[in-house]
Swiss-Prot record:
Organism: Bos taurus
Family affiliation: Belongs to the UQCC3 family.
Mitochondrial intermembrane membrane side: 29-95
Mitochondrial matrix side: 1-7
Assembly behavior: Associates with the ubiquinol-cytochrome c reductase complex (mitochondrial respiratory chain complex III(CIII) or cytochrome b-c1 complex). Interacts with UQCC1. Forms a complex, named COMC, composed of UQCC1, UQCC2; UQCC3 and UQCC4; mediates MT-CYB hemylation and association with the first nuclear-encoded complex III subunit UQCRQ.
Protein known as: Ubiquinol-cytochrome-c reductase complex assembly factor 3
Keyword Ribosomal protein: no
Amino acid sequence: MTTLRKLLLVGALLGAGAGVGTALFALVTPGEERKQAMLKEMPEQYPQRRDEAARTKELLLATLQEAAATQENVAWRKNWMSGGGGGGGGGGRSA
């Protein structure tokens, strides 16, 4: 009998916790108008930011393609933007 009582109590507490969690989630979730406003404020909406992101992706892809085509460890370069073997020796570490 006490086991049944404990199980019912645990079930009631879990149900109450789930109810409180659901209520809090409903309170903090933005409405449809706020969602639309947030989407308009996204950085990708601005052409300059879009172009900058596209350029960054192009540079990353070019670096990955170069790294795949060479045996050099491009991560050790002092200037990643420069091509060729400009590692400089030592990878920028000093004793």
